[in-house]
Each structure stands twice: as C-alpha cells, then as structure tokens.
C-alpha cells in the first residue's frame, strides 16, 4: 500500500484510487467510505467537495457526482432513534443540495458521524 493510501481513511483501495484519479490541483482526499444499500457505491470527502458514486442506473452504468461544499445547504444524520436516545446510532446521512437530497448509508455509525462532521466543517 502506498503512503498516501495509508494516510487517508478509506474502506476499499480501489475506491480511494478512483477518487485520487479525479482530484483537482491543490485538492486532497480526507476519507472514502463504502456505502451499503441500493444506489450508492461510495462517498468521498475531499478538501473541496463531496464525491458520490451513484449506481442506480440500468445495466452496469454508474455516475460520479461532485458536490462542491458551497452548494450543500444542509447535512443530516438519519436516525430512527429520538434525540434522547443515541443520536448517531444509525449509519446514514442525508446531504441537501438545492431541492435534491442524497442519502448515503454506511456500515457503522462512526462513519456517518465522521462524514457529517467533515461536511458541517466545510459548509459552516
């Protein structure tokens, strides 16, 4: 494993490489997390944007969607627990961009918590 891959939080090396191959000048990868459920393949966080792989197309087609932090209006943790319960008990987040909401589900609440906090940092 190369030094860059060791320093970036990621679930799958091939997803990290896919994000790294499309970086802009001066852009760095923060984390790449594998998603579960239908539609989303992974989410990447960089110093400039959120990158989501959308696998909801027919056949073997997929899209890579780049969302600049400046276009994100809000980010939410999706939970079936009350505020009095465990707030980050779920592994899902919702990212609102205009009238569209991207929902991403993870294996583990810590990943959702990290993604939420990184996005919140860049949109605040």
Across the structure, where does each feature detected by a protein language model lie?
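Short secondary-structure transition/capping segments
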Residues: 78-81, 120-124
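Canonical phosphoinositide-binding patch of PH/PH-like domains
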Residues: 94-113
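Phosphoinositide-binding peripheral membrane targeting modules
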Residues: 32-42, 46-92, 96
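Anionic N-terminal interaction surfaces
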Residues: 1-44, 107-109, 114, 121-124
């Amino acid at each position: 494993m190369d030094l860059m891959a060791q320093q970036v939080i990621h679930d799958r090396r091939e997803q990290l490489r896919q994000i790294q191959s499309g970086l802009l000048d001066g852009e760095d990868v923060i984390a790449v997390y594998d998603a579960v459920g239908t539609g989303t393949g992974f989410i990447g966080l960089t110093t400039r944007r959120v990158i989501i792989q959308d696998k909801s197309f027919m056949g073997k087609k997929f899209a890579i969607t780049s969302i600049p932090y400046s276009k994100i209006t809000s980010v939410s943790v999706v939970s079936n627990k009350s505020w009095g319960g465990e707030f980050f008990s779920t592994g899902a987040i919702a990212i609102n961009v205009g009238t569209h909401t991207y929902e991403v589900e993870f294996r583990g609440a810590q990943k959702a918590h990290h993604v939420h906090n990184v996005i919140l940092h860049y949109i605040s």
